[in-house]
């Protein structure tokens, strides 16, 4: 399943990279100021560019870390030692595969996602339940989220490992979310995809000994642009007025690992701190300055 994301460049990646290569030779530094799902940044790394990836959203930050900052397969040394006392660690599997297997078997719980985003829930700020996930998948999300948060708090995960697991969780949730395309609202009935079981999968990591060449930043493009030195800057601003912070609020909550107030029928998190002027007709010109 592909990443359901507005403005994804998967289908035009060769055109974009082709134009970049005309303007900047391989091994040059390219800034991807609004990196989104990281498709362009990843392809640039494959072609031996030095990449600076920036985006406002936390989920994008984790995607870029995973795409740009792995030189070898993760060994999850502390986590494997921790879970070996109560979970079967299979010698025929890699440490990463064992960790994903462990997370897929975490005990579900009725927590924040089940209460706020499933049809069995009783949301605090809505008269009716929201239908973003099946009750079973929402409980799985709650169980896995709690485990990842606890492992992070106990320093059992490195920052790199945490980003990888959050990336995997976001990708798995996006596959089975009961949405038409964005998280601005849910579909009234659970469709076939939403009825399938949440299942984390190992990411096919791009492993290269070039991680020192790449920089990952999070913040407003207008503010971070002046901090970046590069040979070419690739800017892919939003094409419409819909704010990414609102339309992908659930992915942002998964990335942050928090439990924000879910507001209104759609259960939006407070997102004004990630409001983009590039989505506003009256402000976009000043943002480019």
For each predicted feature, which ranges?
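Conserved SAM/SAH-binding loop
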Residues: 218-223
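S-adenosyl-L-methionine
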Residues: 1-34, 39-47, 60-63, 69-70, ...
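A short helix-to-beta-strand connector/capping loop
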Residues: 207-215
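Conserved proline-anchored active-site loop of SAM-dependent methyltransferases
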Residues: 16, 30-44, 53-58, 226-247
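Class I S-adenosyl-L-methionine-dependent methyltransferase module
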Residues: 50, 57, 61-205, 241, ...
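Short, conserved, surface-exposed binding loops centered on an aromatic residue
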Residues: 208, 224-227
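Residue-level preference for short coil/turn positions at secondary-structure junctions
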Residues: 26, 212, 228-229
């Amino acid at each position: 399943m592909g990443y359901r994301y507005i403005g994804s460049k998967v289908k035009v990646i060769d055109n974009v990279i082709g134009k970049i290569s005309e303007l900047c030779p391989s091994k040059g530094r390219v800034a991807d100021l609004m990196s989104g799902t990281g498709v362009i940044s990843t392809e640039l790394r494959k072609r031996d560019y030095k990449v600076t990836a920036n985006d406002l959203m936390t989920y994008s930050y984790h995607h870029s870390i995973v795409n740009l900052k792995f030189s070898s397969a993760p060994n999850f040394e502390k986590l494997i030692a921790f879970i070996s006392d109560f979970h079967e660690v299979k010698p025929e599997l890699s440490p990463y595969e064992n960790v994903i297997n462990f997370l897929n078997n975490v005990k579900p719980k009725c927590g924040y996602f089940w209460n706020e985003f499933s049809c069995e829930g009783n949301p605090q700020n809505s008269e009716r339940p929201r239908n973003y996930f099946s009750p079973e998948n929402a409980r799985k999300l709650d169980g896995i989220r709690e485990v990842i948060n606890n492992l992070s708090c106990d320093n059992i995960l490195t920052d790199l490992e945490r980003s990888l697991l959050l990336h995997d969780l976001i990708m798995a949730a996006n596959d089975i979310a009961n949405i038409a395309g964005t998280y601005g609202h849910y579909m009234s009935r659970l469709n076939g995809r939403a009825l399938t079981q949440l299942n984390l999968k190992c990411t096919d990591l791009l492993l290269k000994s070039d991680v020192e060449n790449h920089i990952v930043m999070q913040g407003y493009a207008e503010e971070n642009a002046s901090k970046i030195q590069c040979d070419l800057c690739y800017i892919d601003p939003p094409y419409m007025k819909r704010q990414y912070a609102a339309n992908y609020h659930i992915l942002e909550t998964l990335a942050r690992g928090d439990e924000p107030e879910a507001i209104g029928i759609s259960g939006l998190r407070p997102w004004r701190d990630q409001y983009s002027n590039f989505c506003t007709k009256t402000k976009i010109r000043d943002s480019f300055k």
